[in-house]
Design a protein with these regions (language model features):
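PLP-dependent amino-acid enzyme catalytic core
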Residues: 19, 42-44, 48-366
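Compositionally biased, low-complexity flexible segments
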Residues: 1-48
Length: 366
C-alpha cells in the first residue's frame, strides 16, 4: 500500500466486532521474522549499533512470509486484534479515540506477538535445538507469550522475573508448564534481566536467551503485524499513535511502519517514573536501556504517575466497560491528555492486556 494513496481515498471504515479479528482484505498476523532478516542471539545493551544496522537493512514492505504464523492451531489466533472506540471518556468530540485491544490474543496480551516472533526467528536461524531451554527475563506477559508458544512447539522454558509480579501471572505460567526464578522485588525488571544474563553466560549450550530488549524480532512483530493492522482498520486515517514503553518493541515497530505509510503520523511514547509500580513498563532511566530503542522514532515522550495509570484503569472499566491492566491505564491517561490538546485527529492507543491478571494487586481496590 502506498504512502499517500490510501489516505487520499479512504473513508471511515467499518471496524471489527470485538475480538472477531475481521480486517477486510488485510490478513496480517503476529509477524514472524525470517532468519535472513536479522541475525541475533544473546544480545546485550552494548549491541545497540549492531541491532540498528539490522533494522536499517530491513525491506520496508509487507512480506508474504509474514502473512500468517506457520505453525497452525492456536498460534493462528495471534494478531488481528480489534479496535475499540473510546466514547464516554473522550474529552474532545473533534478527535476520534480508538484502542487496540491486545488482550484478545490467545495468551491474553500483546506479548503473544513477540513470543511467536522471537521463537520462530530462532528456529529459522538454526539457534534453537530441541534439547535447549528457552530463557528470558520478563515482567510476566512476555513470559506467558513464550510459554504459550513453547507449549505448542514442545520447548522447555525458564523465566526470570521480579517477585513483585502478580500472583495471577505466576499461576498462568505454571499452568503452561513454564519454570521461573524470582528475583528480589526491589531490583525491579533490571534484577530479572541480570539473572537471565548470568544463567546464559554460565551455560550457553543449555540456554537460548531470547533477550526481548535487544532482539530485532521483537519490533519486527509489530512492524509486520500490529502497525499494518492499525493502518487498515483506520482506513489510513490514523494521525497519532500512543504506546507505553516496556521493552519498547511495540512503539519502535509500529512507529517505523506507520511513519513509512505516512510520515506525518505522530508517535507518543508513555514512560513511567523511576521506582514505579506499573507492571510491564520500564523507565528508560533504569540501568538497562533496551538496545532496540531508537529515540528518533518517538515524537513525544509522556511520563505517567502510578496513581494516574491505576485510577484511569479503574475509570475505564466503569465508563467503557472493559477491565484493563496497569500499562493500559497509563496509555489511556496519556491518550486522553493528548486528545484534549488536539484540534482534530484520529488517535490509536495500545491496550496491552486485560485486568484479570491484576486482581491480586491494589489496581482495583482503591
Amino acid at each position: 500500500m502506498g504512502r499517500g494513496g490510501a489516505r487520499a481515498t479512504a473513508e471511515a471504515q467499518p471496524l471489527p466486532s470485538f475480538c472477531a479479528g475481521e480486517l477486510g482484505s488485510l490478513r496480517a498476523e503476529g509477524g514472524t521474522p525470517a532468519a535472513d532478516r536479522a541475525s541475533w542471539g544473546g544480545f546485550r545493551p552494548s549491541d545497540r549499533d549492531r541491532h540498528s544496522r539490522a533494522l536499517e537493512q530491513e525491506e520496508h514492505s509487507m512480506d508474504p512470509r509474514f502473512s500468517r504464523p506457520k505453525s497452525g492451531g492456536v498460534l493462528e489466533m495471534i494478531g488481528n486484534t480489534p479496535l475499540l472506540p473510546i466514547r464516554k471518556l473522550n474529552p474532545n468530540p473533534k478527535v476520534e479515540l480508538w484502542a487496540k485491544v491486545e488482550g484478545c490474543n490467545p495468551g491474553g496480551s500483546i506479548k503473544d506477538r513477540i513470543g511467536l516472533s522471537m521463537i520462530e526467528a530462532a528456529e529459522e536461524a538454526g539457534q534453537l535445538e530441541p534439547e535447549m531451554t528457552i530463557l528470558e527475563a520478563t515482567s510476566g506477559n512476555t513470559g506467558i507469550g513464550l510459554a504459550l508458544v513453547s507449549a505448542v512447539k514442545g520447548y522447555k522454558l525458564l523465566l526470570t522475573m521480579s517477585e513483585a509480579v502478580s500472583v495471577e501471572r505466576r499461576k498462568i505460567l505454571a499452568a503452561f508448564g513454564a519454570e521461573f526464578l524470582l528475583t528480589p522485588g526491589h531490583l525491579g525488571t533490571d534484577g530479572a534481566i541480570e539473572r537471565a544474563y548470568d544463567l546464559a553466560d554460565q551455560q550457553p549450550d543449555r540456554y537460548l536467551l531470547v533477550d526481548q530488549y535487544n532482539n530485532p524480532a521483537n519490533p519486527l512483530a509489530h512492524y509486520h503485524g500490529t502497525a499494518p493492522e492499525i493502518w487498515e482498520q483506520t482506513g489510513g486515517r490514523v494521525t497519532h499513535f500512543v504506546g507505553a514503553l516496556g521493552t519498547t518493541g511495540t512503539v519502535m515497530g509500529c512507529s517505523r511502519r506507520l511513519k513509512e505509510l505516512n510520515p506525518e503520523i505522530r508517535v507518543i511514547a508513555v514512560e513511567p517514573h523511576l521506582g514505579h509500580k506499573i507492571q510491564g513498563l520500564k523507565s528508560l532511566k533504569e540501568a538497562y536501556v533496551p538496545g532496540i530503542f531508537d529515540k528518533r522514532l518517538v515524537d513525544q515522550k509522556v511520563n505517567v504517575a502510578d496513581e494516574d495509570a491505576f485510577a484511569t484503569a479503574r475509570l475505564f472499566a466503569k465508563a467503557e466497560g472493559l477491565l484493563v491492566g496497569m500499562s493500559s491505564g497509563a496509555a489511556v491517561f496519556a491518550a486522553l491528555e493528548l486528545a484534549r490538546s488536539l484540534e482534530r485527529g484520529l488517535v490509536v492507543l495500545i491496550l496491552p492486556d486485560f485486568g484479570e491478571r491484576y486482581l491480586s494487586t491494589n489496581l482495583f481496590t482503591a
